[in-house]
């Protein structure tokens, strides 16, 4: 496994990745790069036939019976947290525990593959309490994420909020909420440009 930080001292926003390198066992029992050093070359020549993969679709629609391989749930099969068949053409997720839970989150995610990316979702949600929320997250793990979500305020009106978790610290960069009135259908977007993230609605 490897990581590709954007700068020498920054985080690896693409997470852990699989890499291939030619290695040898050293006299002291450790794997070392065959050509020495600590940074492997970007490309290797191998004597294998080319195997082209189908490109991952840019847009996901849910007129399907099961999740495609590029969409993942977090530790729980989809049929325990949602459905692709209850409402044709939609992915339905059932409310469960919070985004910080290690046990039962209702999350469907797509891995970030590039340092620059954009994701947009169309979401329909009917929160009844302050504790009910659904939205779009840029998620590294349960201790590090950005979360744009819809919830309800004290008066029962729908609002958008942002939650940021950085280790053990939580904060709301909006210092409050954005009222969206009675709207239950909303488009949410995350735009990632290396170390910069912007949310839109």
Question: Where do the protein language model's features map onto the residues?
Answer:
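Carbohydrate-active catalytic/glycan-binding domains of CAZyme proteins
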Residues: 1-201
């Amino acid at each position: 496994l490897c990581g590709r930080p954007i700068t020498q001292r920054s985080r690896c926003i693409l997470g852990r990745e699989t890499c291939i390198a030619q290695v040898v066992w050293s006299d002291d029992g450790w794997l070392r790069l065959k050509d020495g050093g600590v940074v492997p070359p970007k490309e290797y020549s191998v004597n294998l036939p080319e195997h082209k993969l189908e490109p991952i679709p840019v847009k996901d629609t849910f007129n399907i019976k099961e999740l495609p391989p590029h969409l993942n749930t977090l530790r729980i099969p989809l049929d325990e947290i949602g459905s692709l068949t209850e409402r044709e053409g939609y992915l339905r997720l059932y409310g469960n525990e919070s985004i910080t839970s290690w046990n039962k989150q209702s999350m469907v995610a797509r891995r970030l593959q590039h340092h620059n990316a954009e994701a947009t979702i169309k979401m329909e949600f009917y929160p009844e309490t302050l504790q009910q929320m659904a939205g779009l997250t840029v998620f590294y793990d349960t201790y590090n994420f950005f979360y744009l979500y819809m919830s309800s305020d004290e008066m029962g009106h729908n609002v958008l909020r942002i939650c940021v978790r950085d280790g053990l610290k939580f904060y709301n960069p909006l210092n409050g909420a954005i009222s969206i009135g009675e709207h239950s259908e909303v488009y949410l977007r995350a735009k990632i440009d290396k170390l910069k993230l912007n949310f839109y609605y």
